[in-house]
Amino acid sequence: MSNVPTNESGYDVIAEVVQRYVDGAKSGRGEDMKPAFHKDATVFGYIGADLFAGPIQQLFDWNDENGPATGLQARIASIDVIDTVATVRLELDNWTGHRFTDLFTVLKVDGEWKIINKVFHLHS
């Protein structure tokens, strides 16, 4: 069960932030997804046996290297909001032929919702 508010301060604004990330994935340009993330955000997950971890710039670079994912399908599975903190589960199909589950920690910083951390699972 998830808490999915339908007001401007919650779900709708957070969904827009996540959509910026998805739009960047579709365009294949890290710069397009960058506004969704806090400047100090991090990313963690495995690609095969290799840990993909560190500053969010690594994700932007990976996205640039892999190019557009025009066939990408994304669905927000859940959003849970507690005042200035939120978590989001995003299901992604056909990102460069792969399926991912992303888990985001989102924080309201200076009045703006920003992704602080992305942890992902690459489905086999």
Where are these regions (language model features)?
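Generic secondary-structure microfeatures
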Residues: 37, 45-47, 108
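Beta-strand-connecting loop/turn residues
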Residues: 39, 84, 111-112
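Short beta-strand edge/turn micro-motifs at domain boundaries
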Residues: 99-124
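Surface-exposed, charged secondary-structure patches
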Residues: 6-13, 42-99
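Short beta-strand segments enriched in hydrophobic/aromatic residues
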Residues: 37, 92-94, 119-120
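Short, low-complexity N-terminal intrinsically disordered segments enriched in polar/charged residues
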Residues: 1-31, 35-39, 52
